[in-house]
Amino acid sequence: MLRRRVSAELPVFPWDTLSDVTAKARAHAGGIVDLSVGTPVDPVAPLIREALAAASAEPGYPTTAGTAALRRSAISALERRYGITGVGEQAVLPVIGTKELIAWLPTLLGLGPDDLVVVPELAYPTYDVGARLAGAQVVVADSLTQVGPRTPALVFINSPSNPTGKVLGVDHLRKVVGWARERGAVIASDECYLGLSWDASPLSVLHPSVSGGDHTGLLAVHSLSKTS
């Protein structure tokens, strides 16, 4: 049986290609402002440190879905911070990291060589990596017209964008949702930076003004490390 050599199909991560220029920038007298990886650099809030310390004597593995209290807390935060309503406890799933979720999502959806995954032109590289790991086809597009007559199985969107900061307006989001639903495609909205905005007010794909109160086929991805 022929085996697919996955490593040969994966792109070179941009951080690897930036190593030389990063070293040069660090040697500069003014130092470097490194925006290449979204690693938290601020001090951990005392409240979080205290909560972790208090839970340090509770060994054991949690359930995959997390505790009911955790899911209720997430639902409350989504409504309080972003105006997202209508999310039930069964619609919330804590994961070990959003990067891992994004990388595995095409595989978890059962996608393969006959399936199409749409990713933004300038975007987090793991969208592309996840599609390739599943053996799916990748289309790089920032507009629906670029996809053409083809029918995707999964569409990644990212607002506010990493790395450009671009925010997709409500009309644009509604159009993408309608377009995807007409084709039976799942939308995975990477909303890790939803709470970080300046001039524009970003909206979740789950917001009533975007989804119409129907979350069918919509997946919003949030990141604890970007909001804590």
What do the predicted segments below correspond to?
Residues A25-H28, A134, E182-R183:
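Helix C-cap/helix->beta junction micro-motif
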Residues L2, V6-G97, W104:
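N-terminal small-domain helix-loop-helix segment of the aminotransferase-like
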Residues E58-W179, G195-H215, L219-S223:
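Conserved core of the PLP fold type I
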Residues E191:
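Walker B catalytic acidic pair
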Residues I187-A188:
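Residue-level marker for buried hydrophobic side chains located in beta-strands
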Residues S36, H222-S225:
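Active-site beta-alpha turn of Rossmann-fold NAD(P)-dependent dehydrogenases/reductases
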Residues L10, V44, T164-L168, S197, ...:
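Secondary-structure boundary/capping motif
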